[in-house]
């Protein structure tokens, strides 16, 4: 078996007229997984009496894949998360009445605000989804990772 080395020029210094070389071994391990090597599993979480922020941090870590040893920041290596009993989720302190969520329509004077109490009456899953969304990256990868979150009312889910 022949042992050979391939060198790559990483810097050429014209002043002193020498070359910095780095050795490239073709049999070295890759630091990141390829797309075809990624695997996903499913987690089921019961949100009964869970605090929104603490549950959102656990979910965002699972969705991003930070609980795996193969975590890669630029790839979607996370797992799917199913959350049930979302109507029984809670906030600490007086945040349920006092916290405000803002959104803007894009028109002048178009800022809208709502509290978790009003949001919980219409869409109980929206508060947790917003918390998880704001913990994920803001680009295309974050939007793709957010689709791995499934939230359902009650014990039964499809």
Residue ranges and their predicted role:
Residues 8-28:
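Short, Lys/Arg-enriched N-terminal segments with co-localized hydrophobic residues
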Residues 26-130, 137-140, 158:
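Ribosome large-subunit tunnel/peptidyl-transferase-proximal elements
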């Amino acid at each position: 078996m022949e042992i050979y080395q391939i060198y790559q020029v990483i810097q050429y210094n014209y002043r002193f007229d020498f070359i910095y070389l780095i050795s490239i071994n073709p049999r070295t391990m890759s630091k990141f997984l390829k797309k075809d090597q990624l695997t996903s599993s499913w987690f089921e979480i019961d949100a009964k009496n869970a605090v929104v922020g603490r549950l959102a941090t656990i979910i965002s870590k699972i969705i991003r894949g930070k609980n795996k040893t193969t975590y890669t920041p630029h790839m979607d290596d996370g797992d799917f998360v199913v959350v049930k009993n979302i109507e029984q989720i809670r906030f600490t302190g007086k945040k349920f009445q006092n916290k405000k969520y803002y959104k803007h329509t894009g028109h002048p004077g178009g800022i809208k605000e709502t509290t978790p109490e009003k949001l919980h009456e219409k869409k109980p899953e929206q508060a947790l989804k917003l918390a998880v969304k704001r913990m994920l990256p803001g680009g295309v990868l974050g939007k793709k990772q957010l689709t791995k979150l499934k939230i359902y009312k009650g014990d039964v889910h499809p």
